[in-house]
Amino acid sequence: MLTSFNAFLDTVDSLVWGIPLIALILFTGLLLTVRLGFMQIRKLPLAVHFLTANETSGEHGEVSSFGALCVALSATIGTGNIVGVATAICAGGPGALFWMWLAALVGTATKYSECMLACKYRTVAKDGHIIGGPFYYIEKGMGQNWKWLAKLFAFFGVLVGLFGIGTFSQINGITSAIRGFFDPDSAHTVRVLGVLPEVSTSVAISGVVLTIVVALVLIGGMKRISKVAEFVVPFMAIIYVICGVAILLFNVTKIPGAFVEIFQSAFGLRAAAGGAMGAMIVAMQKGIARGIFSNEAGIGSAPIAAAAAQVEEPAQQGLVSMLGTVIDTLIICTITGLAIVITGAWKVEGLEGAAVTTRAFQDALPIPSQAAAFILMLCLCFFAFTTILGWDYYSERCLEYLTNDNQKIVSGYRWLYIFCIFIGPYMTVSAVWTIADIVNGLMALPNLVALIALNGVVVAETKKYFAKRENKISALTRS
């Protein structure tokens, strides 16, 4: 029964993440990159400046520009960076990392565009809080005739929260990492409530504790999520990057060989002639799918957080938000991927998910293996924890749109979300990630269509902002 279900999921996954969706993701990113004049490269220093400057603050919004980015990063920097990269490389070979980079490069322009549009078309909910995202820029930007597409996006957004990035994959990754450290052989097991599958005691205990902690934070709403994210995300990201850079420095002679392996695998050059195209397609599918899972460029989630930023100019928040893709994929995922390829951890039989990355850290860091495993477990737990918080916020905003801001339904949904966190540890790793891929792809489709339709608005708004900025700078210079 379970085998048939997994086979069904694999079939659906192959259909959703076929060539058409991959082509649409790359086309959207390339279109916006070209039309914006490679702005993600030219304006990167300005984006970093806006991150810390007071220049972005405005009257509208609930959190700072930095806070909005941290909420977005809290939702994106999660198991995708540690477990997702490992599963992509194990399934598609080292070449998956190349396609992840390519998707991120053009995805940075996508992230700028969707977050800018979210700020431009945001609105105020009945209780006074700011709400925005693809559902509003589809409805307001494309017109009422496209409201069905906005509702479709919001519906898939709820599904991604419940079954995709938000719950199952994150809590499953956390508890798997904890079990791998405290009880790798599952010597101590328990059957919770007498009906759930038998699991390691460490999994059961950590699952219950995390469910309670998440529930306490979620009750506080957006501002509490923002405060937690602003503290946790930078701290844990710095620790992870330091460990990753240490791995690369201690294995610097292996880096050139790793890049050769990545590029050969990306284009199927190591496969037999007849299987080269097939190997390339698998690497492309897994790399782009996991890249989207990790940085969420094009999915339409980050715009929901960006809409709450205290900015007057939509383009400013777009610039700040695009840094999320740079930090998430081009830095953190690259560190994970290179560590896995350099150490060959992806080739070890019997390892999957977090265990692959753990093995890479243990083999590459010049510290006791238990210490390396503990550091990775800690990073994974905090990354995944903040992702759970961020995706509750995203999916609740989607549900508010679907239900015309019915807070009774939203409150009920919050408890359903918490329940999904409770049962997540008892699901298999492969099923969790396949379900996540499927719903992510479905959520991305309406948003990508909207970004293509509204690319003219993006370009016009961007030109208007930079013209205004140039005039302001010129006036200050003359005075």
Residue ranges of model-derived segments:
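N-terminal alpha-helical transmembrane segments of multi-pass membrane transport
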Residues: 1-79, 89-96, 107, 249, ...
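Alpha-helical membrane segments and immediately flanking helix-loop junctions
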Residues: 58-91, 117-141, 152-155, 159, ...
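Flexible loop linkers connecting adjacent transmembrane helices
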Residues: 38-65, 87-97, 101, 109-145, ...
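Membrane-interface loop-to-helix entry segments
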Residues: 24-31, 39-48, 171-178, 201-251, ...
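Membrane-interface alpha-helices at helix entry/exit sites of multi-pass transporters
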Residues: 57-62, 94-102, 137-152, 186-196, ...
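Helix-loop-helix module between adjacent transmembrane segments
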Residues: 28, 32-33, 74, 103-128, ...
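Transmembrane helix-loop junctions in multi-pass membrane proteins
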Residues: 5, 36-40, 80-85, 161-174, ...
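Extracellular/periplasmic helix-exit of transmembrane alpha-helices
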Residues: 33, 114-121, 126, 243-261, ...
